[in-house]
Amino acid sequence: MGMRMMFTVFLLVVLATTVVSFTSDRAPDGRNAAAKAFGLITPTVRKGCCSNPACMLKNPNLC
């Protein structure tokens, strides 16, 4: 194989890897993993803050 052909194959492999990794971290409903994690963390923070009077006074919008 020539240098040009090897470079073309390299680019195709990089493109295929990028497409696979980009689509594999998406959830079926369209939300990605970071958005799901944030959705799980938020109620936990609210629950912890609302039980602490000092935090509740600082963040009344959470409780």
UniProtKB/Swiss-Prot annotation:
Residues 1-21 form the signal peptide. GO terms for cellular component: extracellular region; host cell postsynaptic membrane. The keyword Disulfide bond applies. Disulfide bonds join 49-55, 50-63. PROSITE patterns: ALPHA_CONOTOXIN (PS60014). Expressed by the venom duct. Its main location: secreted. Residues 22-47 form a propeptide. This amidated peptide potently and teversibly inhibits Cav2.2/CACNA1B. Steady-state inactivation is enhanced at hyperpolarized membrane potentials. Also shows a weak interaction at alpha-3-beta-4/ CHRNA3-CHRNB4 and alpha-7/CHRNA7 nAChRs subtypes. In vivo, exhibits a potent analgesic activity in rat partial sciatic nerve injury and chronic constriction injury models. This is Omega-conotoxin Eu1.6. It comes from Conus eburneus (Ivory cone).
